[in-house]
Amino acid sequence: MNEHNPAHRPLSGTTVLEFASILAIPSCGVHLADMGADVIKVEPLTGDPHRYGVGPVLPDESKGFTTMNRGKKGIALDLAALESRQIIKRLVEQADIILMSLKLSDLTKFGLEYEDVKKWNERIIFLEHAPYGRGGPYGQEGGYDVVVQGMSGLASVMARDINGTPGVLTPAVADMATGLASALAVITALRHRDLTGEGQKVSTSLLQTSLILAGNRIHWFAATDPEVWNSAAEALSEAQHDGKSFEQQRDIYTAITNPGGGPATNTYFRYYRATDQFFSVGALSHNLRTKFCSVLGVTDPRTNEFNMSNPDDYDRLVSFTRQCEDIIRGKVAQHWIELFRKNGVPSGPFNFPHQVFDEQQISDNNFILELEHKMLGKYKTYGPAIQMEKTPVFPNSSSPSLGEHTREVLVSLGYVDEEIDHLIKKNIIRQYE
């Protein structure tokens, strides 16, 4: 972790204020901290709710919070207090970037809209995260991954069927992708400021990110889709009225919008079950599919005259897929991985979380890092999203305790110990002891 000089990281000297909780924007803060930014996480006196979420390991810290808040300083204050507003004003005056994911109604309540804070610092870059976008009936509400998965259509194409109902996609893919998009947004705005001297507001949303994640499946073309979509909508409505399961509904929908698609005929881009384990195959091009068939000694029925809309041809394709499954089930996964890769077919292991730490491809590239937590000791977690040759990217510390750096930060703003002690006594700020 300390093999490089922290001062040489690309965002060294950049100050970021993070008013955010749970996943999406805190993960953005992690990316910026890994790149060297001085990220100050501003929490309420009770702390980010993620502190008390899944995997509690300390009274005020969960495993999830630890992994989503490494490399940050932490202060805790009562946003509603007048004295806190003065603290925030001083923070903003010295900051470069604000990451804001408070509900839009709270921004107005606490005077933290972009128009408010830019009066204190016109060069500030203000990331406003409105989970569903600012407009519309959901615009003022807090956002959750499960809601946007459903609203965006992402779950309809990716979710599993659990007892007839769609299962939520986990981990929270929209949250994590939004964190990356948010980091891209503020760094792009930082570049604009370098060129022009101007700050600005930038925006991200979970809903927009979800639409992007589903982008190769959710689209509409006037030349081909209106009639198909009308037929699919009618069939889906009937299936829902009849109480069919989610999987049945999706199969009906897919049969109309993507004839011949679906798991029954997916031969080349999927996970297979070998004698011992699962493994992956990714053969999308004609050349790769030919190699796949050569390895297994099979012939794809589509190499001859074939019509997917013909029931007999469709059944032949289903039988072909089952044939491949039966052959593969006869040997162990490693045999097939080595054989496919030797013949140029993309293939790899299917790992559960505990196996990731022993995966050579991951360890050889330092994609997993070992960090030190002041109370928990050593732990392993994901590495930075990017690497740079001239300006190394790496985390420099673990997550902060609730209010761990409150006194340190306030002293840097010009507060003296007597003032800080008074604010602590009035329960306006919190300092970890």
Stretches with model-predicted labels:
Residues 222-262:
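Charged, glycine/proline-rich intrinsically disordered loops and linkers
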Residues 252-256, 260-343, 347:
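Aromatic-enriched alpha-helical interface/lid elements that frame and gate functional surfaces
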Residues 167-177, 197, 201, 259-260, ...:
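A short glycine-threonine-serine/GTX helix/turn-capping micro-motif
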Residues 46, 131-133, 206-213, 218, ...:
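Glycine-rich beta-alpha junction loops
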Residues 1-15, 239, 243-246, 252, ...:
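Terminal low-complexity tails and localization/encapsulation signals of metabolic enzymes
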Residues 167-231:
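Conserved anion/nucleotide-ligand pocket segment
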Residues 1-195, 401, 407-433:
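N-terminal helix-loop segment corresponding to the beta1-alpha1 unit
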Residues 39, 341-355, 416-421:
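Short, well-structured beta-strand/strand-turn elements
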